[in-house]
């Protein structure tokens, strides 16, 4: 009887004991000791990882493996820690070890493929690749009409799009799932056959009305403000305006179909000039359609002549970008990146290279009834296509993206108030481009494959309107003569933060030093002479970049480094490889921008980091100043989402590893990730 009771008690104990890690060493007491030590180090490693202490977590996972060599779960986590620390080669090595042990399945294999691909291919997203349909927004819901004859669209920073519905005289806003979230009909008497919509530099919208012979101005939310223009052939008059564009000075350009010309208005709506009539070297427009302004160059398509023509801001003809007859019936023409135009032609979408006029076919909708009247790039790297005749709105994605799906990563799990759990999840495509605008319906969180309770989407970092900034100052000898410019640049950057977020100043001397950390308002009287770090012939810039990034890992979800330099530093990257530094910044969503205090070119190393981390290079005396640098950082898309749910797991007093999974869906694309965490010790 005593023996039976003993066996029963032993069974109960074993059923509830911690069995997260299995010892591969010899049996007996050594097995129990090794498992216990490994589990404790593993728990510490997971907690360090979620605190953003990646180097510390690497050491703790290595200790766990010293007790349990080859444990796949620990190998997976060690790979994650190396990845976030920017050491992607070591991360891939650990993940491959885990994969060879039969761990992770397709999920781990996909992660290895994506990270490997990112390391060996260019970060450039590629403007000449093929796109194919990944989804569409229906024009009816049961017996209810949603839109009719979509004619143009405009992307928004939150992932949504505006669509002009020509047939219903409306401007509609769709979220990423194709749900209408806002519907506008213009002035009191309504739109009169709206044709195109653009966003002006002040944030307002401009809508051309082809039957109303006018241009309406709306707020950023679509509320009507005013309109200008009138029917006629005189200055500032229109007959059937079609497509719109705006230049750097706020002037608005409209292709005037009825008068076969382009009409230019100032920012207030006053007519300035018109052009496109027959002149020397140019025989005049026959049917001007799409228009795009790129710097000081104006490009106009003609649907009858089938070419693209270039003018200056005064309306002088400069030449032919794409020869007559190249296109069958070109319509919309929009700038795409800095080097291409996006053009629609019947059932096709083309990319046109600005430097050469080379034409690349990007997408085709088929051979049926089709007339594509606009194609624009959205916030997620798709092309939104409006098909006037087919009455469809298509979402076109790169073919490689449809095959590979999303790259989804758990970045942090906060379980301090267990059973309430908060998780932060990042969603990207295979080329590291964030996926923004997702809603709660696009996610499914499970624990042990069972849906969690009280699941709520708390927010999306992409909607944040401020950022934390690290200002990195070059202390090379050449910077001595730029102290006045440096002081002014720091003050201007800090002032443009409007007292929001935190700013730190790191000086890149022989040894990097954190000179300041606090509210940007405290830098209103900053002077370069107050910096403690001495000038040096060889500043340790790589260590300074690493130090700057370390301070931003746990900062606001939007964050960036701004490097101030005269541009001629050499031999400054000796401790860390450029690829590892760039990976560290990218894997923690930290951008790197450069402000040059002289007209010298930045070093190749700095250019590489700036180019590959969503950064931008600025000259201190550029006409618009440095006031928009912070805004540019805030405007960088972020695919980070935060959720809250209630866990149903037992924690074994905080010693049990609790699994959690997430799946993300959008139209015909999906992605998933798995992780785990520990509740607080009791």
What positions do the PLM features span?
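Beta-rich, blade/repeat-based domains predominating
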Residues: 142-158, 188-201, 234-248, 280-295, ...
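C-terminal "exit" segments of structured domains
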Residues: 401-404, 414-421, 611, 621-682
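Acidic, polar low-complexity linker/tail segments
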Residues: 404-470, 477-482
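Conserved beta-propeller blade signature
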Residues: 160-163, 204-207, 251-254, 297-300, ...
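Blade-level signature of beta-propeller repeat domains, shared across WD40, Kelch, NHL, RCC1
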Residues: 367-409
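Exposed acidic/Ser/Thr-rich ligand/metal-binding surfaces
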Residues: 274, 484-487, 495, 499, ...
């Amino acid at each position: 009887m005593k023996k039976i009771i003993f066996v029963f008690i032993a069974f109960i104990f074993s059923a509830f004991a911690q069995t997260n890690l299995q010892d591969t060493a010899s049996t007996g007491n050594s097995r129990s000791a090794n498992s216990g030590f490994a589990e404790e180090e593993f728990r510490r490693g997971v907690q360090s990882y979620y605190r953003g202490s990646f180097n510390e977590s690497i050491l703790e996972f290595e200790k766990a493996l010293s007790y349990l060599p080859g444990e796949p779960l620990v190998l997976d986590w060690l790979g994650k820690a190396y990845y976030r620390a920017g050491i992607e080669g070591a991360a891939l090595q650990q993940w491959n070890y885990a994969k060879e042990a039969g761990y992770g399945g397709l999920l781990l294999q996909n992660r290895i493929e994506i990270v490997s691909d990112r390391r060996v291919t260019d970060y450039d997203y590629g403007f000449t690749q093929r796109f194919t349909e990944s989804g569409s927004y229906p024009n009816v819901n049961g017996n209810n009409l949603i839109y009719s004859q979509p004619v143009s669209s405009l992307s928004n920073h939150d992932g949504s799009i505006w669509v002009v519905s020509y047939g219903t005289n409306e401007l509609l806003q769709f979220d990423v799932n194709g749900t209408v979230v806002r519907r506008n009909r213009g002035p009191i008497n309504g739109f009169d056959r709206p044709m195109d919509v653009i966003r002006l530099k002040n944030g307002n919208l401009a809508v051309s009305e082809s039957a109303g012979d006018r241009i309406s101005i709306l707020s950023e939310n679509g509320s009507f403000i005013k309109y200008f223009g009138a029917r006629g052939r005189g200055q500032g008059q229109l007959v059937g305006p079609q497509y719109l564009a705006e230049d750097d000075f706020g002037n608005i350009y409209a292709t005037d179909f009825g008068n076969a010309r382009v009409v230019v208005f100032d920012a207030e709506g006053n007519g300035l000039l018109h052009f496109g009539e027959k002149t020397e070297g140019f025989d005049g427009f026959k049917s001007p359609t799409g228009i795009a302004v790129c710097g000081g160059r104006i490009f106009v398509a003609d649907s009858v002549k089938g070419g693209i023509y270039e003018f200056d801001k005064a309306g002088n003809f400069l030449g032919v970008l794409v020869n007559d007859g190249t296109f069958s019936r070109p319509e919309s023409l929009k700038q795409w990146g800095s080097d291409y135009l996006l053009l629609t032609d019947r059932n096709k979408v083309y990319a046109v290279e600005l430097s050469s006029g080379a034409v690349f076919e990007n997408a085709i909708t088929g051979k049926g009834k089709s007339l594509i009247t606009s194609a624009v790039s959205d916030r997620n790297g798709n092309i939104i296509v409006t098909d006037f005749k087919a009455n469809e709105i298509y979402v076109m994605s790169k073919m490689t993206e449809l095959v590979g799906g999303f790259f989804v990563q758990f970045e942090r799990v906060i379980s301090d108030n267990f059973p309430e759990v908060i998780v932060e999840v990042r969603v990207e495509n295979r080329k590291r481009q964030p996926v923004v605008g997702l809603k709660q319906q696009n996610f499914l969180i499970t624990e042990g494959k069972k849906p969690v309770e009280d699941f709520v989407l708390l927010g999306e970092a992409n909607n944040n309107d401020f950022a934390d900034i690290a200002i990195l100052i070059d202390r090379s000898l050449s910077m001595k003569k730029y102290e006045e410019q440096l002081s002014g640049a720091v003050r201007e950057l800090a002032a443009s933060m409007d007292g929001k977020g935190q700013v730190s100043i790191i000086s890149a001397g022989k040894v990097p030093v954190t000179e300041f950390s606090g509210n940007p308002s405290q830098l209103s009287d900053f002077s370069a002479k107050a910096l403690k770090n001495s000038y040096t012939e060889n500043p340790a810039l790589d260590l300074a970049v690493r130090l700057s990034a370390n301070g931003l890992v746990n900062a606001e979800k939007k964050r960036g480094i701004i490097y101030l330099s005269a541009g001629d530093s050499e031999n400054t990257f000796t401790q860390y490889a450029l690829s590892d530094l760039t990976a560290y910044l990218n894997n923690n969503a930290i951008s790197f921008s450069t402000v040059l205090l002289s007209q010298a070119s930045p070093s190749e190393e700095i250019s590489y980091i700036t180019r590959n981390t969503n950064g931008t290079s600025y000259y201190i005396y550029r006409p618009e100043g440095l006031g928009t640098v912070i805004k540019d950082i805030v405007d960088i898309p972020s695919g980070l989402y935060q959720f809250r749910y209630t866990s149903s797991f037992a924690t074994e007093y905080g010693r049990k590893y609790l699994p959690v999974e997430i799946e993300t869906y959008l139209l015909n694309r999906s992605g998933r990730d798995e992780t785990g965490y520990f509740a607080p010790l009791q």
